[in-house]
C-alpha cells in the first residue's frame, strides 16, 4: 500500500483498518532531542509523508532517521487530519490516539535497511511549502530568524503556546514559516542564532498554519 492509497481509504474521523496490508516507510523524524513527543514521521517509497502515534518514549532507539519500517495495518486506525495521513489507535471514539507500547512491535517491524538522511531531505524554498510536504524532512537555505525574534531563546515561557514557542524565520524574498520548539527540547534554552543559514526539520500543520 502507498500513502495515497491509505488516504483514499481514510476519512476525517478515525476508522479501523481491517485488511492485511503493509505500508512501507522510511523514518524522517527523531525524538532524541526532545522536540518530538510520541510521534514518528515517515515517508513512503514515493516520498509522501505520514505520521504514526506511539505511546512510548525514545522511539529513536528503534526507529531512527533513515530506518526502513514495515507497518502492519490490520486493526490499526487511520485518519486524514489537517491534510495528512495519521496512523495509530483509537482515542475518544473518533480520533487517532497512540498505539499502546505493548503492541508496537506487532505493527512496526524494523528492516535491516537504513538509508542516508540526505536521500530523504527535500531542499526547498519557503514559498514551495504545501500539504504535499507534510511529515517530510525539509531544508531551507539562506534563511534567518526575524529581527524581532533575535535576543530570545528558541523556547520562551512568556511566549508559551501549548508547551512550545513559535518563532518565525524569513528568507531573502520575505517569505515566512514558523519554527516550533518544545519546552522539553534539548536546545530550548539556546539563544536564537543571528545571520543567515540552513535549517532542517519535519513539516507539520496545525489548523491553517504550516510549521
Predicted regions and their residues:
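OB-fold nucleic-acid-binding modules
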Residues: 1-211
